[in-house]
UniProtKB/Swiss-Prot annotation:
Protein keywords: Cell membrane, Membrane, Sporulation, Transmembrane, Transmembrane helix
Organism the protein comes from: Bacillus subtilis (strain 168)
Family affiliation: Belongs to the SpmB family.
InterPro entries in the cross-refs: Gate_dom, SpmB
Gene encoding the protein: spmB
Lineage: Bacteria, Bacillati, Bacillota, Bacilli, Bacillales
Location of this chain's protein in the cell: Cell membrane
Cellular compartments per GO CC: plasma membrane
Protein name: Spore maturation protein B
Length: 178
């Protein structure tokens, strides 16, 4: 166990030293390459800010308008009828939109129901099995100038749906139902 702890502490310095050693062997100007990469990273960060602000405003309007609550109220009875706790419905809906909001919901569910409860486990697995599809598409596609993202959106939302369904099945099989 002690060797694992040592390895986990030493891994990042070992990787950095390995990259520097490899660069030196290949005669790559490692510092200059690092600085150039940093400049490119800053340029990319600045270029995605408008898309990020637009997405955050849209999320805020969606939540503040009551549209999210309306959709959740419509879906909760259907989820409850098939044995899915109504408490995780908001998480399943908000996760493709906002990672921060979804993490906040997951944290709240764990605080209320406990990490070892069915709801806590389901929320945790759901959080890890899905992605912020709309955020990813808006920010990254916007950064590279892709305007038509319809197919990517369909596939991304389908992947999120599969992640939610898989979360429910796996948590139910491993830990029993609510």
């Amino acid at each position: 166990m002690e060797i694992i702890n040592w390895l986990s502490l030493a891994m990042i310095p070992i990787i950095i030293a390995g990259i520097l050693l490899y660069g030196t062997i290949k005669k790559v100007p490692t510092y200059e390459s690092f600085v150039e990469g940093g400049k490119e990273g800053i340029e990319i960060a600045f270029s995605i800010i408008p898309y990020l602000v637009g997405m955050l405003v849209a999320i805020t309007v969606f939540r503040s308008s009551g549209a999210l609550d309306f959709i959740m109220d419509l879906l909760k009875p259907a989820f409850s009828a098939i044995g899915i706790p109504a408490e995780v419905v908001p998480l399943a809906l908000i996760r493709p939109i906002s990672g921060t909001a979804a993490l906040g919901m997951t944290t709240d569910l764990i605080a209320v129901y406990g990490p070892d409860s069915f709801i806590g486990r389901l929320a945790s697995v759901m959080q890890g099995s899905t992605d912020t599809t709309l955020y990813v598409l808006t920010v990254y596609f916007g950064a590279v100038g892709i305007k038509k993202m319809g197919d990517a959106l369909k596939v991304g939302l389908l992947a999120d749906l599969i992640g939610v369904v898989a979360s429910i099945i796996i948590v139910t099989l491993l830990f029993g139902s609510a």
